[in-house]
Regions:
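Flexible hinge/switch segments at interdomain interfaces of large molecular machines
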Residues: 154-162, 218
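Catalytic-core regions of hydrolytic enzymes
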Residues: 27-157, 172-184, 188
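Active-site-adjacent mobile loop/cap segments within catalytic or ligand-binding domains
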Residues: 36, 47, 110-111, 164-234
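Bacterial N-terminal signal peptides that target proteins for export
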Residues: 2-13
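Short alpha-helical linear motifs
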Residues: 143, 160-161, 227-228
C-alpha cells in the first residue's frame, strides 16, 4: 500500500507540473505559481469514517506529501489551508487562497457510499446534475453547521436545499473553463496513470469552491467505505 501511495504522489506531482506549464502558460516570468492544497475536514470535523478510517487524517496526509514534493521546485509556491488536525471554516479556506492570490485551489477529500463503490472523481463548482452529486455536496457542505455564525457567513445558505446551490455558481463562473480543464487533467491522470475507475468530472455545489477567485477543483480520491480502497488510501 505504501508503494501504491508513493506512486500516486509522484505521478500527481508530475501531473500538476504539466498542468502548470500547459494551462497557465501566461504566468509572469520569474513569478512562482501558487497552489493552495486544502486538506478537507479536520479537528472536530472528522469527515467520513468508513471502515474506521478518518477522512480528515487521510486528506491531510495526502496534502502534506504532495506539498512536500512540489516544494522541491523553485517555480512553485505551496500554501496549505491546514497542516495539522485543526478545524478550519470553509469560507476561511477560500480566504487563505484569495489572500495568497493563488493560481490554483485543490480541495482533497475521500468519498463514502456503499461498500461496492470505488474509484476517484473530480468536481468543479456547478449545479447538481443528479441526486448523487447533490448528496456528495450536501455531505461536504454540512460542516458549516459546526461553524459559529454560519447563517451570517453564508448568507442563509442551506446545504439541504438544492435551490440554495444556484447562488453558489455565479461567483465562480469566471474561472469555470479553467477549472474544468484542470479537473479533466486530474481525472485523466487517475484513470490512465493509476488505472483507477473513472468516476468522471462532475459539477456540484460545494461551498468551499464558491468563494475562491481562481480555478478550483475538489478531488474525491476514493471511497473509505470500500475496504480495499480504504486500505489503498490509508
Amino acid at each position: 500500500m505504501i508503494k501504491n501511495l508513493n506512486l500516486l504522489l509522484r505521478n500527481f506531482v508530475c501531473l500538476l507540473f504539466l498542468l502548470f506549464v500547459n494551462l497557465f502558460f501566461s504566468q509572469i516570468d520569474n513569478e512562482k505559481f501558487t497552489v493552495v492544497l486544502d486538506a478537507g475536514h479536520g479537528g472536530k470535523d472528522p469527515g467520513n469514517r468508513g471502515n474506521g478510517y478518518y477522512e480528515k487524517n487521510i486528506a491531510l496526509s495526502i496534502a502534506l506529501k504532495i506539498g512536500k514534493e512540489l516544494e522541491k521546485r523553485n517555480d512553485i509556491k505551496i500554501i496549505y489551508t491546514r497542516k495539522t488536525d485543526v478545524f478550519v471554516d470553509l469560507f476561511k479556506r477560500a480566504q487563505i487562497a484569495n489572500k495568497a492570490k493563488a493560481d490554483l485551489f485543490i480541495s482533497i477529500h475521500c468519498d463514502a457510499h456503499n461498500s461496492n463503490a470505488y474509484g476517484a472523481g473530480t468536481f468543479v463548482l456547478g449545479l447538481h446534475a443528479n441526486q448523487r452529486n447533490f448528496e456528495i455536496a450536501k455531505k461536504e457542505n454540512s460542516v458549516i453547521f459546526k461553524e459559529k455564525n454560519y447563517e451570517q457567513n453564508y448568507g442563509g445558505f442551506n446545504p439541504n436545499n438544492p435551490e440554495s446551490v444556484i447562488s453558489l455558481v455565479l461567483m465562480q463562473e469566471e474561472y469555470l473553463d479553467q477549472s474544468i480543464v484542470a479537473a479533466n487533467l486530474i481525472q485523466e491522470f487517475f484513470t490512465k496513470n493509476l488505472k483507477r475507475k473513472n468516476r468522471t468530472v462532475k459539477q456540484a455545489g460545494f461551498i468551499v469552491l464558491k468563494y475562491t477567485y481562481m480555478p478550483s477543483v475538489l478531488v474525491e480520491t476514493g471511497f473509505l467505505t470500500n475496504k480495499n480502497e480504504g486500505k489503498y488510501l490509508n
